[in-house]
Amino acid sequence: MPRDNRLYSGFVNHDYILTFSIADEANRARLVALCAGPWQGDEVTPDTWEVSNTLSPDQMERAILELMGDADRAAYYYLSDSKRMFRVLLG
């Protein structure tokens, strides 16, 4: 089976730990608004959130990348179907 470079998870809701450093205040505010709103997140620190949503890991990554500049950094952690924790570094 050829690899398609997608991150799969069979869970209906996905739980993530997201930590980020985004310099642009508008983009940072948009990410915080996503975490607090539709992503159903709980603030751990101003730059770290626990979120639970229906986005797949690929969709989550694309949504975060859209808000990041060249010097920004983000990492998220998620649990896979096999109960393994994965860390994805962005930026």
Per-range role (PLM):
Residues 7, 18, 27-30, 50, ...:
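Low-complexity, compositionally biased segments
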Residues 6-22:
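Short glycine-/aliphatic-rich beta-strand segments at the starts of folded cytosolic domains
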Residues 11, 23-44, 80-91:
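Charged, amphipathic alpha-helical regulatory modules used
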Residues 21-24, 53:
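Short loop or secondary-structure boundary microenvironments that flank
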Residues 38-82, 86-87:
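Short, intrinsically disordered low-complexity segments
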Residues 1-3, 30-34, 56-59:
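Short amphipathic alpha-helical surface micro-motifs
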Residues 1, 9, 13, 69-71, ...:
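Short linear sequence motifs
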Residues 2-7, 88-90:
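Short, solvent-exposed beta-alpha or beta-beta edge segments that form flexible loop/patches at the rim
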